[in-house]
UniProtKB/Swiss-Prot annotation:
InterPro entries (alphabetical): Apolipo_AcylTrfase (IPR004563), C-N_Hydrolase (IPR003010), C-N_Hydrolase_sf (IPR036526), LNT_N (IPR045378)
Protein name: Apolipoprotein N-acyltransferase
Enzyme class: transferase
Gene expressing this chain: lnt
Organism, scientific name: Shewanella oneidensis (strain ATCC 700550 / JCM 31522 / CIP 106686 / LMG 19005 / NCIMB 14063 / MR-1)
Main localization (coarse): membrane
Record-annotated membrane-spanning stretches: 22-42, 63-83, 101-121, 134-154, 174-194, 202-222, 492-512
Coiled coil: none
Length: 518
């Protein structure tokens, strides 16, 4: 008898271990849904198989099942994070990979909480339409939303981003990337029910497909204005190892000016994040001359720079050649804080170090150049460039949809994001970053321009399509004429709030149902 019990326990243990391995593999496969692969169909299929596997699990087992799925998703999907740590942060490769794995494990806690909640709410009915088509999407969406702001947030590879090149992307103009995560989870729930031979659940795909293909475009209030703006996006391709070296400052400035010289016919010239790798006061003569050149050629130059206010330093964007009355009276550049954008959402470790007194002595990784920035205001006016209103986001900020949405208004002509993704080499990180920027264009219904140090530098239309781009890791200038549009998308009007209210209401219903069942 004892032998039989022991054999049964060992078999059950092996099955549990196998389930965790399969969950990890399914999670890892979701990385193929994001750039550069963009195999959008993989995410809902992998999620549906993981959901099907978890149907009969108790809360503890469900937690670890989805923890394994999440760890696979992030360990593979954001494996590029370690590149900056070992290449530029001074950490040995094993240490950088270990830190990346710890980050992936932390991020996996959010899918794990989804699994825990799913099992807790539905212990008596794990095959129901309610569980798969409503409760699971609500839990998944709320945990993804939480991942976007807890501990400053890391809203990378949301499930919704898998649709940036997929057939459902038009829905983002109504419900945003987070709403697409809800839809992906709902589709996964329907597929999981099919594995249990409940085929009628597939009917949920019909209204989703109809809305994506027909209703969403009909609801669009985005219309062309008949006007256009010509832009020139400069990709300097400055080696990251040289970027902050004092002897490289003036060669860098001259390189950007020389590259721009043949494109002074553009309305707006954009240089990337921290293209001028020095405080304004150190390069005042250069700024004065660049301002005069921009005015003489009737163009504007938007450039990344380090600005200073009292004792604080900011990762900023400024506009040279503003053409207002003040500029005409005094052609020199005046650093008065007007027509300037200061980055608000700073990157932990890269731009500020939490517990810096403790962490900075540990390794060079915690002493990266310019890792002591102050935070700009959450809401700042659009930049004005030759009469055009530009809503900016610097690097990491483009991943936060509500922040950019709050900056866009009916008068906004362009979305602008600048970045320096040289930290991540030839990895998938910069390509995923580009994918996120494309989603912001769909959500807000505005063309987007993206200028980077070494790629991806690109122009995106209001539907999220890349219309022009430079090759990565090359020096060059991308020149494009962009048709302007007007109007607001539904997401620009309402944001994520209705979706979050819906998800919260579904959880409340789930709690009431559970209480009644007890």
């Amino acid at each position: 008898m004892l032998t039989n019990i022991r054999a049964f326990a060992q078999q059950k243990s092996r099955l549990s271990a196998l389930r965790l391995v399969l969950a990890f593999i399914l999670g890892a496969s979701t990385a193929l849904s994001f750039a550069p692969y963009s195999l959008w169909i993989i995410y809902p299929i992998a999620m549906s198989l993981a959901l099907w596997q978890s149907e009969s699990l108790n809360p503890k087992a469900s937690f670890f099942h989805w923890l394994s799925f999440g760890f696979g998703c992030f360990a593979v999907g954001i494996s590029w994070v370690h590149v900056s740590m070992d290449t530029f942060g001074g950490l040995p490769l094993p240490a950088s990979v270990a830190l990346m794995a710890l980050l992936a494990l932390y991020l996996a806690l959010y899918p794990a909480l989804t699994g825990l909640g799913l099992a807790w709410f539905t212990r008596t009915n794990s095959h129901s339409l309610w569980r798969n088509l409503l409760l699971f999407p609500a839990l998944w969406t709320l945990t993804e939303w939480a991942r976007g702001w807890v501990l400053t947030g890391f809203p990378w590879i949301w499930a919704g981003y898998s649709q940036t090149e997929g057939p459902l992307k038009a829905l983002a103009s109504i419900i945003g990337a987070l709403g697409l995560s809800f839809i992906i989870a709902m589709i996964a729930g329907a597929l999981a029910l099919c594995f249990s031979k409940r085929y009628k659940s597939l009917l949920i795909l019909l209204p989703i497909t109809a809305v994506a293909a027909w209703v969403a475009p009909k609801l669009s209030q985005i219309q062309p204005t008949g006007e256009s703006v010509k832009v020139a996006l400069v990709q300097g391709n400055i080696p990251q190892s040289m970027k902050w070296e004092p002897e490289a400052l003036w060669p860098t400035l001259l390189k950007y000016m020389d590259l721009s010289r043949e494109h002074f016919d553009a309305d707006i010239i954009v240089w990337p994040e921290a293209a001028i790798p020095a405080p304004e006061s150190m390069v005042q003569d250069f700024l004065d001359n660049a301002n005069k050149v921009a005015n003489l050629n009737h163009t504007s130059i938007i450039t990344g720079i380090i600005s200073r206010q009292q004792e604080d330093f900011y990762n900023s964007l400024i506009v040279l050649g503003n053409h207002n009355q003040k500029q005409q009276d005094n052609p020199d550049y005046e650093s008065d804080g007007s027509n300037q954008f200061k980055k608000h959402h700073l990157l932990p470790i890269g731009e500020f170090v939490p517990f810096q007194a403790l962490l900075r002595p540990i390794a060079p990784f915690f002493n990266l150049p310019m890792s002591s920035f102050a935070r700009g205001d959450y809401l700042q006016p659009n930049l004005s460039a030759l009469g055009h209103k530009v809503a900016p986001a610097i690097c990491y900020e483009i991943a936060f949809p509500e922040q950019l949405r709050d900056s866009v208004n009916l008068g906004t002509d362009l979305l602008l994001t600048v970045s320096n993704d040289a930290w991540f080499g030839t990895s998938n990180g910069p390509l995923q970053h580009m994918e996120i920027a494309q989603m912001r264009a769909i959500e807000l219904g505005r063309p987007l321009v993206r200028a980077t140090n070494n790629g991806v530098t690109a122009v995106v239309d209001e539907n999220g399509n890349i219309t022009a781009a430079l090759p990565q890791f090359e020096t060059g200038v991308l020149s494009a004429t962009i048709p302007l549009v007007t109007g607001q998308t539904w997401f620009a009007k309402i944001g994520q709030t209705p979706l979050l209210i819906l998800c919260g209401a579904l959880l409340l219903v789930g709690f009431i149902r559970r209480q009644k069942q007890q």
